[in-house]
């Protein structure tokens, strides 16, 4: 990873920390929802309106100086999880998620949208496990999520997020390396 990319990722992660505690809002089918594709609103406005997992990552992508691409995909909402799957797939940026790989910080983890109940998910690798950075499932991710009574932008371990819903097979399907998504 070049110094410029590493610097961009550090700054983006620093910005992500400022959004911890932002309320999570679930996207509801057929409702207008601003996935924050065109601007980064004030922190107050973001807190007032909340984010879902995709709109949170859209903010991070924009903070990294990238523009959210226009939607050219049928039956996708610009900036949503299905949009990102189709976009990254069309640009050959997806790699199969493998929890034995030590991914670089800033890697995005994606589960594709399936339906209104399983809307997919997207999160960013934030910190390595301090005792052994090769144990990626112990590493921390930042994402907008709901789990039990928690509905916010927060930090969890990748392993907890990966196995809390799909215990046998795991939740995340793809990884998008920073060197790839920074080409947006």
Say what each PLM segment does.
Residues 1-72, 182-184:
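N-terminal capping segments
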Residues 2, 6, 10, 138-139, ...:
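Low-complexity, intrinsically disordered short peptide segments enriched in small/polar/basic residues
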Residues 10, 66-152:
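...with weaker cross-activation on analogous glycine-rich loops/strands in unrelated enzymes
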Residues 25, 84, 124-127, 158, ...:
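Intrinsically disordered, low-complexity, compositionally biased regions/tails
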Residues 38-41, 87-93, 166:
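Charged, glycine/proline-rich intrinsically disordered loops and linkers
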Residues 50-61, 106, 139-147, 176-181:
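Extended, compositionally biased low-complexity polar/Lys-Gly-rich tracts
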Residues 156-184:
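Low-complexity, Gly/Ser/Thr/Pro-rich intrinsically disordered linker/tail segments
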């Amino acid at each position: 990873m070049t110094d410029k990319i590493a610097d961009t990722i550090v700054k983006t992660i620093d910005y992500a920390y400022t959004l911890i505690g932002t309320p999570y809002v679930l996207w509801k089918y057929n409702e207008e929802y601003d996935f924050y594709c065109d601007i980064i609103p004030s922190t107050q406005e973001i807190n007032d309106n909340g984010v879902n997992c995709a709109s949170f990552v859209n903010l991070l992508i924009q903070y990294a100086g990238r523009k959210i691409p226009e939607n050219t995909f049928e039956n996708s909402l610009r900036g949503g999880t299905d949009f990102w799957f189709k976009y990254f797939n069309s640009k050959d940026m997806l790699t199969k998620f493998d929890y034995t790989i030590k991914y670089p910080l800033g890697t995005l983890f994606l589960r594709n949208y399936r339906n209104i109940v399983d809307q997919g998910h997207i999160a960013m690798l934030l910190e390595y496990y301090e005792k052994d950075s090769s144990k990626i499932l112990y590493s921390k991710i930042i994402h907008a999520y709901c789990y039990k009574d928690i509905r916010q932008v927060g930090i969890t371990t990748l392993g907890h997020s990966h196995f809390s819903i799909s215990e046998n097979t795991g939740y995340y399907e793809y990884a998008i390396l920073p060197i790839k998504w920074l080409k947006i």
